[in-house]
Amino acid sequence: MNIVSDVNYATSVAALRMLQASSVLDITEEDFDFLTGDKIWIATDRNRARRCVEACVYGTLDFVGYPRFPAPVEFIAAVIAYYVHPVNIQTACLVMEGAEFSENIINGVERPVNAAELFAYTLRIKAGFKETVIDAEENARQKLRANGLK
């Protein structure tokens, strides 16, 4: 695992925390059931699927009437991992492809991800990156020890 992967994962963890803390989704109960349900999305569901995922990504902005701005891959993948039923994760990645990693947005580099990359990244989030969490905890402990704390 490299530094970029660790930073991307940490960004996704922050996104998951934001999702858990937010109760603002600009989505109907019927659409929420569609998004989280185990019914497989078919081709004719594509627009609804995108609208539902976007409602979770941009819910707060939409609710208060602010304009949307491009969300990074880390946030979109976190939304997909958190809300979309596993049978529809690949489809959600397909309809949401084209986003950029936060680092690229910050650096002004245009490199949109395709569906396969978004899917792979979403799987990493679903898996929890156990080794990343363990490494992060160990790094935090080392910093505390270096500062004289146990």
Curated annotation (Swiss-Prot):
Protein transport listed as a keyword: no
GO CC annotations, alphabetized: host cell cytoplasm
Keyword Amino-acid biosynthesis: no
Coiled-coil regions listed: none
GO biological process, one term: viral procapsid maturation
Keywords per UniProt: Host cytoplasm, Viral capsid assembly, Viral release from host cell
Compartments (UniProt record): Host cytoplasm
Domain of life per record: Viruses
Main location: host cell
InterPro entries linked to this entry: Scaffold_D, Scaffold_D_sf
Function: Assembles the procapsid by joining twelve 12S pre-assembly complex into a T=1 icosahedral particle, called 108S procapsid. Ten proteins D bind each 12S complex, which are formed by three pentamers of F, G, B protein and a H protein. The scaffolding protein is released from the provirion after genome packaging to form the mature virion.
Further details from the record: Phi KhT, a host-range mutant of phi K, can grow on E.coli C and B, besides K12, and is more thermosensitive than the parental phage phi K.
Family statement: Belongs to the microvirus D protein family.
Subunit structure: Component of the procapsid particle composed of 60 copies of the internally located B, 240 copies of the external scaffolding protein D, 60 copies of each of the viral structural proteins F and G, and 12 copies of protein H.
Protein known as: External scaffolding protein D
